[in-house]
Amino acid sequence: ESLQANPWIEGVDIKREFPHRLVVTPRERVAKVIVYIPADDVAWAVSEKGVWIAPVSLIAGASAEGKPVGPDPKTGQLPEGATMLEGLDAALAAAKMAHALLLTDAPSDVNPKGGKEVTSKVVLAGLEYAKGFSVKFLQQIKDLSIPSVEAISANLNNGVEVSLGAADNIAEKERVVMGLLEKESGVTYVNVRKPGAYTFRSAPL
């Protein structure tokens, strides 16, 4: 019962071994996305199955090399020489360390509860993108902005903004964006809400 009370534990497998031994193996939930709610300056982990897991610590920093670092589990302090991060920057670092996609600009009416299923349509849409994009494309995404379902957009590491809209035709949207970035230079904005009729802007060379 104490294990199952932990929101990071999805369930337990119990195996009986001869003669009188029980082996209990917990099944842990893994964060697929981290949802940052700026109005409350909190971040929550969400599993691939769409369950709010628990709040994520925003005590995060950047090493001298610019890599995200978390606090020491024993002391709660950041490593010596690390730069303290706050707000969105801390949430980005937390998501990187969790190997999860960061969902930003979540509406203030998003109401996380540990161990409960996500009911927010915009968070579920962001989760669908995280599950539908390839690992290669996810590695190029800095964060996913989710103010509303129709206004979902991806901010890429190279500075390009990609307007995605509702979570449909996900693989096709990725294919269009990847192909466009390979073919065109100086792209700053791509609109693939309708991947068959996409538009883009480029910076003047």
Feature annotation, model-predicted:
Residues 11-205:
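Charged, solvent-exposed interaction patches on well-folded alpha/beta domains
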